[in-house]
Amino acid sequence: MFFYLSKKISIPNNVKLQCVSWNKEQGFIACGGEDGLLKVLKLETQTDDAKLRGLAAPSNLSMNQTLEGHSGSVQVVTWNEQYQKLTTSDENGLIIVWMLYKGSWIEEMINNRNKSVVRSMSWNADGQKICIVYEDGAVIVGSVDGNRIWGKDLKGIQLSHVTWSADSKVLLFGMANGEIHIYDNQGNFMIKMKLSCLVNVTGAISIAGIHWYHGTEGYVEPDCPCLAVCFDNGRCQIMRHENDQNPVLIDTGMYVVGIQWNHMGSVLAVAGFQKAAMQDKDVNIVQFYTPFGEHLGTLKVPGKEISALSWEGGGLKIALAVDSFIYFANIRPNYKWGYCSNTVVYAYTRPDRPEYCVVFWDTKNNEKYVKYVKGLISITTCGDFCILATKADENHPQEENEMETFGATFVLVLCNSIGTPLDPKYIDIVPLFVAMTKTHVIAASKEAFYTWQYRVAKKLTALEINQITRSRKEGRERIYHVDDTPSGSMDGVLDYSKTIQGTRDPICAITASDKILIVGRESGTIQRYSLPNVGLIQKYSLNCRAYQLSLNCNSSRLAIIDISGVLTFFDLDARVTDSTGQQVVGELLKLERRDVWDMKWAKDNPDLFAMMEKTRMYVFRNLDPEEPIQTSGYICNFEDLEIKSVLLDEILKDPEHPNKDYLINFEIRSLRDSRALIEKVGIKDASQFIEDNPHPRLWRLLAEAALQKLDLYTAEQAFVRCKDYQGIKFVKRLGKLLSESMKQAEVVGYFGRFEEAERTYLEMDRRDLAIGLRLKLGDWFRVLQLLKTGSGDADDSLLEQANNAIGDYFADRQKWLNAVQYYVQGRNQERLAECYYMLEDYEGLENLAISLPENHKLLPEIAQMFVRVGMCEQAVTAFLKCSQPKAAVDTCVHLNQWNKAVELAKNHSMKEIGSLLARYASHLLEKNKTLDAIELYRKANYFFDAAKLMFKIADEEAKKGSKPLRVKKLYVLSALLIEQYHEQMKNAQRGKVKGKSSEATSALAGLLEEEVLSTTDRFTDNAWRGAEAYHFFILAQRQLYEGCVDTALKTALHLKDYEDIIPPVEIYSLLALCACASRAFGTCSKAFIKLKSLETLSSEQKQQYEDLALEIFTKHTSKDNRKPELDSLMEGGEGKLPTCVATGSPITEYQFWMCSVCKHGVLAQEISHYSFCPLCHSPVG
């Protein structure tokens, strides 16, 4: 981090300043001083030039207002940024609140206790409350609108400072005796703060400043120290919270007057003065520290006595009140950033996330890739890759092959230019300094350095990828202590015990090239090692402590920026004679520059470098500077006589939206001069100038200029000089062209002015060349346009190619509907199928399948698409069209379309379907899914098996005593399946019998075959018995309830034939009941006799029946009134009349209705009341 003074504003009449405060949001600067002086200033930059943004832009005072109202010396000024208010107080205790009205500051409120002087005022984080403390111990908390919230007198205490916590729950009060007391936000005392920094301090001390950073811009890392307390004797402590028992301790070694955090809590500035060595007067200085107490640097400030400091809102400037002046210093922060292959990598913190947000901004395509990285330490780049040095995440253990560094606390992550991690390395030393070359990564702590010869995947052979062996690992990773003298042989090993040994002369900077590694130490010693075998070659001695080291492209010179921003150069190979007459290697060059904060060597010239000095960029050639360029950018890259610079300050104001305007290219003087010569003087003179100052970039410039003028001889010579083989070939090709306009068009195309080139071709009536140009560029939209606009016939194959390429363009962007239009025209069936599928346009997909010829290679793919969405029929059609019946059957099975599966299997003589069906059915039965198995058999047209299972269910339900209606339905369903089975057998036989035999004969043969198959099964002979039994059982009860007792008796009498289906006890109980109601006591008596003889009844039940019979037959004789009619019903056997299923009566007429499904009859006069058959419920035809 570097800082330098940039501006000075003097206060009229030499009035001494006491305080200064910079409004972070609006940029106003308030300063107060003696004799009631109070001024509000505003510095504004006016520039439209993109290069002059940020610190480099000239700034002027846009506001300089003196506020009248104080008479005594103004001692405290504080801003309320949320509500744009300024609160000031003077030595008489007068407090004034100012507000901005129509561009100037006016008094809003005044308050004067007249008792004591205000020592400190503090607004809370949201600007709602202010706390004011007086010297006599009075505390007042007020609201932003001027109302008093509470007040308190702390007896016997002299107050000097106050500050709020970030959440406004805690107040810290600093006392005149140096103590700090912690109170809650209602003014209740909680505890005294432990001041570890004052251990062993004697004498009177006072608090110089308390500043609590509120986390508005996020924290450098989670749980980062943010509360700074500093005393006038230079002792300071930085705490994580008010009760932190283990704070960061600093001894600044100076008399302190004030402290302040920057806008993001990453830098603490401490202002004060020091006794200068060998002088009586004090020296004003500002020291800068990190939250962890690391010293970042010292800024010396002229003048007698510094009294206050304040940061600007962006953290790039700091205002210092010294005597009757305000000095401004510019800050050049240590951003975590890098540049690799057109990508700017930068990191920033966000208040809503604990990690660093690392952005990989591809400046060529203006795309950005964001990664969140925990515990980021630094970013280092080289070529196409970058290294992120981070703290290891405790929650994630390392991989198995990292066992030898287990417990490693840091990680070096190798990433490509879009942030993809390629290779992490866990190490056990703090990577304070990281350097990177095309082959090596070097990380150094203060005592040791680690080298890793990295390889990236594209360079690895398959063999190496397979053998990540320990030996190879050790060959690639080494560790060396800075005090060791390695010889360059294989003596470096991965031994972390070396890092534990300390050193008296720690490392302070490193740099490396492909050939050498340079390590700088705090004493000024520079150690030079060879690479890739690390051997100590040379030690040099400098009289400064290096902060940043940099090697030129041939590793002959070293640039050193020290901690105070002085740039010097060292020639590593020069041999000189020292004062004692001995010859030594290495020489400090004469050039020295001050206030330097960045430098970069040219990649292609060892004598060229660019450096940043204050807000100017200088380019040096052989240590001679060119005229400076005004800018504050960080240098990304210097090659081809062009410098690429990035305005990181501007980018980090809005890091989520980097703007290409913040990337600036500067051309160095020789390039500018050559360009001017070519334009004004001509090619001949320019070529002489370039001959005297040769550089490939200048020769290329000359070649391009010669091409523009079609001076092919000069162009070819220049291309040869810059070794541009493509350019030479292009010139040769141009030489063979006859037409001047054709040459001109080619040249225009070469320079990327494609519209102009196309226009020229079309004017020459060479549409083919225009199309060829667009083809090379891949601009298919324009190709299509040109093909369609031409007068002659367009090339069909090219048209198709163009349509397909445009279809691909839309498909890549998932605009399927647009893609379809072009694929149709390009007849690209493969991509069409994909688009229809993505659009869920299955009709279009089906039509496409229909339009394809048989056995087309796309059909199986389309069929699979239908399978994936469950469209069985379309899938089967597609499979059959490409002669894949097995796949069609598998699809039907997969989608549970078993009937279709069986049909296909039969049609294509496939034997395995039966076994597959049986396997699936048994699987269902095992899981007790009998109904699913029945459905499976039914769909597969295996009606007989389905019926068997159905009868089984019906029998089980009957045994359970379920509702009779349900049982009847189950028996009807079973019988219907049997009927379907009969029908199937007949049809199968009809199909088999060919020739002259009649239909009746074939049907009969089918039945005979079926007879042979089913002799064993009783239900195939009389499938309807179960249904009949429960039908009559329900019908008899219904007739009984309706009061038709005679018909009920007739129906109940039928049940005697069904004792094997309905339990006899239920049959004869119902019969007895109906007979008794019908007064047919003879029949009733027979029913009771039957009941008594049943073996299934218990003796108690039999006794109950006996008692009931006794009761009935003591009153009535056991005779039937209508004997003959009942007798005819009681007779069974062959001569039995058919029964009407609607009434239960026998059918005596010759004509009656018969159901076509169950073959049961209904009396002719009854059927007119029914729409469906009373037994099987099939429609009455």
Curated annotation (Swiss-Prot):
Compartment(s): Cytoplasm, Cytoskeleton, Microtubule organizing center, Centrosome; Cytoplasm, Cytoskeleton, Cilium axoneme; Cytoplasm, Cytoskeleton, Cilium basal body
Effect of substituting R478K: In SRTD7; chondrocyte cell lines from the patient show a reduction of cilia indicating a defect in ciliogenesis
Coiled coil: none
Main location group: cytoplasm
GO cellular component, one term: ciliary basal body
Keyword Metal-binding: no
Effect caused by changing W311L: In SRTD7 and SRTD7/20; the SRTD7/20 patient also carries variant INTU 276-Q--L-942 del; chondrocyte cell lines from a patient show a reduction of cilia indicating a defect in ciliogenesis
WD repeat boundaries on the chain: 4-43, 61-100, 105-143, 147-185, 193-241, 246-288
Induction details: By TNF.
Alphabetic keyword roster: Cell projection, Ciliopathy, Cilium, Cilium biogenesis/degradation, Cytoplasm, Cytoskeleton, Disease variant, Ectodermal dysplasia, Repeat, WD repeat
Pfam hit, one: Beta-prop_WDR35_TULP_N
InterPro entries assigned: Beta-prop_WDR35_2nd, Beta-prop_WDR35_TULP_N, Ift122/121, TPR_IFT80_172_dom, WD40/YVTN_repeat-like_dom_sf, WD40_repeat_dom_sf, WD40_rpt, WDR35
GO biological process, one term: intraciliary retrograde transport
Record carries keyword Cytoplasm: yes
Role noted for this protein: As a component of the IFT complex A (IFT-A), a complex required for retrograde ciliary transport and entry into cilia of G protein-coupled receptors (GPCRs), it is involved in ciliogenesis and ciliary protein trafficking. May promote CASP3 activation and TNF-stimulated apoptosis.
Subunit structure comment from the entry: Component of the IFT complex A (IFT-A) complex. IFT-A complex is divided into a core subcomplex composed of IFT122:IFT140:WDR19 which is associated with TULP3 and a peripheral subcomplex composed of IFT43:WDR35:TTC21B. Interacts directy with IFT122, ITF43 and TTC21B. Interacts with IFT43. Interacts with CFAP61.
Pathology noted in the entry: Cranioectodermal dysplasia 2: A disorder characterized by craniofacial, skeletal and ectodermal abnormalities. Clinical features include short stature, dolichocephaly, craniosynostosis, narrow thorax with pectus excavatum, short limbs, brachydactyly, joint laxity, narrow palpebral fissures, telecanthus with hypertelorism, low-set simple ears, everted lower lip, and short neck. Teeth abnormalities include widely spaced, hypoplastic and fused teeth. Short-rib thoracic dysplasia 7 with or without polydactyly: A form of short-rib thoracic dysplasia, a group of autosomal recessive ciliopathies that are characterized by a constricted thoracic cage, short ribs, shortened tubular bones, and a 'trident' appearance of the acetabular roof. Polydactyly is variably present. Non-skeletal involvement can include cleft lip/palate as well as anomalies of major organs such as the brain, eye, heart, kidneys, liver, pancreas, intestines, and genitalia.
Identification of the protein by name: WD repeat-containing protein 35
Species of origin: Homo sapiens
